Curated annotation (Swiss-Prot):
Zn(2+) 2 binds at C58, C61, C107, C110. A zinc finger (FYVE-type) spans 36-115. Residues 413-419 are annotated as: G-loop. It comes from Acanthamoeba polyphaga mimivirus. GO terms for molecular function: 1-phosphatidylinositol-3-kinase activity; zinc ion binding. Zn(2+) 1 binds at C42, C45, C66, C69. This is Putative phosphatidylinositol kinase L615.
């Protein structure tokens, strides 16, 4: 998590004397090429693409144009450093680029901009060698308009850097030149704190207009004086307006919880104790459920931490309730599996701070689940008499619920690849069915945390209950986990097997309720279903991992494939599973409810895309995905530098293409026959018959 990487996810060994020319920025809105499947019209002339009007990527801005609007070629200099990368290898244009000579295809707008940037590159480089503040730059004459625009764009774009960004020397110079104006501008304060190498203070102190700093020859005095000045900037009143400082719409006067988490993500091990205390004072004000949704991050911090003061802050934050202590303890125990000696020492030191009697109890209960895992292939014998000889067992994700017995005659083994087991337990609150999976559920846990946070964010911003369905998930080891099964819910596959439509099923389950209320519940949940699909990139969507509650709430299960990955990548399906059966419930395409559904999806996009840092941080806690994969997905899906209308348009295109897409039908076919082994058996039969034919032909000759 703390490994420094550049914005392509690679280890960064940037030379401090980097050539200024290599930092000329173009103010591109895209970080990766726009995905082909998200666009149906030319970015410029808006004409619809067809078999005759084909798509062409501009190699400079990454947008998609028709031939007429992107038919210019120019050499794009290497010093333009914010060119978007191909989103993935499915873009045909990715391969065509390598067939071109030095001149590359660009749109009309980029053609003239590249020429202008090339002509002014030397002037820009001279300014960036020792950049002044935004106030100084604004005083330059009209003849410097391109240079001013470049400076403004660079400063503005700093606010969109991902949490893993490694700051160039030019980034640092521009940040420090403007530091005195950052008071009460939260997003700039985040990057001011993150741009400083707190271990060495390798920065130009005079940028702070504080000459007295240089007289402190003693390193600790120097560092303290420097820290005091940063604290002054944080606490000082606002000096310039958001408009004058080119702030984003998410700028606030005080750092938020998300801002603090962003700073901790990459700087937690080197921040001075006073800054840590300041950040944790803000984090302490956050509701427990949000803290719990970030528990995986805090556990990773504990695992890598050797700072006793930070350990104290973490202990105070994470031990406010027995529920939180249980949750953190279990995640810590699991994290030992992939830890070195120092990490295990750090984890154990934190556990020793907990109440000793409670630790003994949690350890005993952990051993119960560890024993169950060993016997999952045939759990009946293990569970038959276990509750006669041991005390009640707490659920790790909710210790107030105690397992008191088990329905051994109702244990079911599911017919899927890893053969997960469903066990029905007696508890102090009634029967609970738990699915034990023989694979990692860390993806599921992180996705469920994000879904829960999305619910909170939507409520806070528009006061709307979208009927998001969440359910407890708990890793037991790195290769096993437990998921509590939602009561009174069925998969769409099960509903269709009953010869019912989704609409009929919901009506049958709600005979005594007002139909319009039921339809509204379903519509709201369909909005959340759509937004989760889009912003998390849920893959492997088929009718057996989409469920509907008896109340009419539709929701996802099984998050083994996220970030646009899929079990059947060759189907090239869209990121959202929608069919006519799902849409008929709200009246189908063209209905009033369908229009409201689209409008709510658009509002959700505007709200959730502001939280791209939160998504990046939580998704990066799962080691199954490389950082550059997560980064490319976040930048292509959230597009933080783009206008809302562009991202909304792309989502609407996906929704439109999702209606009964043939690839979705193929996916359901492949999933069903893979589960039933009919496809495998059929192929075996075909191969056997082919072999018999060849054999008989050989014998006859």
């Amino acid at each position: 998590m703390n490994q420094k990487q550049d914005n392509h996810g690679n280890n960064n060994h940037r030379d401090d004397n980097i050539d200024i020319n290599s930092s000329i920025m173009f103010n591109n809105k895209n970080n990766v090429w726009v995905d082909d499947v998200m666009v149906s019209r030319c970015y410029n002339c808006k004409k619809k693409f067809s078999m005759l009007r084909r798509k062409h990527h501009c190699r400079n801005c990454g947008n998609i144009f028709c031939y007429n609007c992107a038919n210019k070629f120019i050499v794009i200099p290497n010093f333009i450093n914010d060119r978007p990368e191909p989103a993935d290898y499915w873009n045909i244009s990715y391969y065509i680029t390598s067939l071109k000579d030095e001149a590359e295809r660009v749109c009309d707008n980029c053609y003239y901009k590249v020429k202008e940037k090339t002509a002014n590159s030397e002037k820009i480089a001279n300014i960036l060698k020792n950049p002044g503040s935004i106030v100084d730059i604004s005083k330059l004459s009209v003849s410097y308009s391109d240079i001013k625009d470049h400076y403004y764009n660079h400063l503005r774009n700093i606010q969109y850097y991902l949490p893993n960004h490694v700051y160039s020397q030019i980034d640092k110079k521009i940040i420090l030149a403007n530091a005195k104006y950052f008071s009460k501008h939260s997003k700039y304060l985040v990057h001011l704190i993150k741009a400083i190498d707190w271990n060495t203070i390798k920065i130009t102190d005079d940028k702070f207009d504080s000459p007295s700093v240089s007289i402190y020859k003693n390193r600790s005095q120097h560092k303290q004086k420097f820290l005091d000045h940063i604290c002054e900037i944080i606490e000082n009143p606002k000096k310039v307006s958001c408009q004058d400082l080119l702030c984003t719409r998410t700028c606030q006067e005080q750092l938020s919880f998300d801002d603090c988490i962003n700073i901790l993500y990459s700087k937690v091990q080197e921040l001075p104790d006073s800054l840590l205390q300041y950040l944790f004072a803000i984090i302490e004000l956050t509701p427990d459920d949000i803290i719990k949704n970030h528990a995986v991050l805090f556990v990773n911090i504990i695992k890598n931490n050797s700072n006793i003061f930070l350990e104290k802050l973490l202990y105070e934050l994470l031990t406010k309730s027995e529920d939180m202590i249980y949750y953190i303890y279990w995640l810590l125990v699991i994290s030992k599996e992939k830890a070195d000696y120092q990490d295990i020492t750090n984890i154990q030191r934190f556990i020793e701070l907990l109440d000793k009697q409670l630790v003994v109890k949690m350890d005993r209960e952990y051993r119960f689940y560890a024993g169950l895992i060993k016997h999952l292939n045939d759990p009946k014998d293990y569970l038959e008499n276990i509750f006669d000889i041991c005390d009640e067992i707490s659920l790790p994700y909710n210790p107030s619920i105690k397992l008191t017995g088990v329905y051994t005659d109702q244990i079911r083994i599911k017919n899927s690849y890893t053969r997960p087991v469903i066990i029905a337990f007696e508890t102090n609150v009634g029967r609970i069915d738990i699915l034990f999976k023989k694979e990692s559920v860390m993806n599921d846990l992180i996705v469920m945390n994000l879904i829960s946070l999305c619910d909170v964010i939507i409520k806070e911003n528009i006061g709307l209950e979208l009927g998001i369905v969440v359910y407890p998930i708990m890793p037991l080891t790195n290769n096993f986990g437990m998921i509590e099964i939602i009561k009174n819910a069925e998969t769409i596959h099960s509903i269709i097997n009953q010869k019912k439509t989704v609409f009929q099923h919901i009506i049958d389950k709600n005979e005594n309720k007002v139909i319009s209320d039921i339809m509204k519940t379903y519509m709201y949940s369909l909005v959340s279903y759509t937004l989760h699909s889009y912003f998390i990139g849920l893959g492997d969507r088929h009718l057996e991992n989409i469920m509907i509650t008896d109340n009419g709430e539709i929701f996802h299960i099984d998050f083994g494939f996220i970030l646009g990955t899929d079990a059947f990548p060759l189907t090239l399906t869209s990121d959202i599973k929608l069919n006519s059966g799902m849409l008929d419930v709200i009246g189908g395409r063209g209905s009033d409810r369908y229009k409201i559904y689209l409008d709510l999806c658009a509002k959700g996009v505007i709200i959730l895309r502001k939280y791209f840092n939160m998504f990046f941080i939580l998704l990066s806690q799962n080691s199954n995905y490389k950082i550059n994969h997560i980064e490319n997905f976040i930048m292509s899906r959230f597009q933080p530098r783009q206008h809302d209308t562009v991202v909304i348009s792309e989502l609407m295109t996906i929704i439109e293409k999702s209606h009964d897409a043939y690839t979705g039908i193929i996916r359901d076919f492949l999933h069903y026959h893979n589960q039933e082994k009919t496809l495998q058996n059929g192929m075996t039969k075909v191969l056997k018959e082919a072999y018999d034919v060849v054999k008989s032909f050989t014998n006859s000759t």
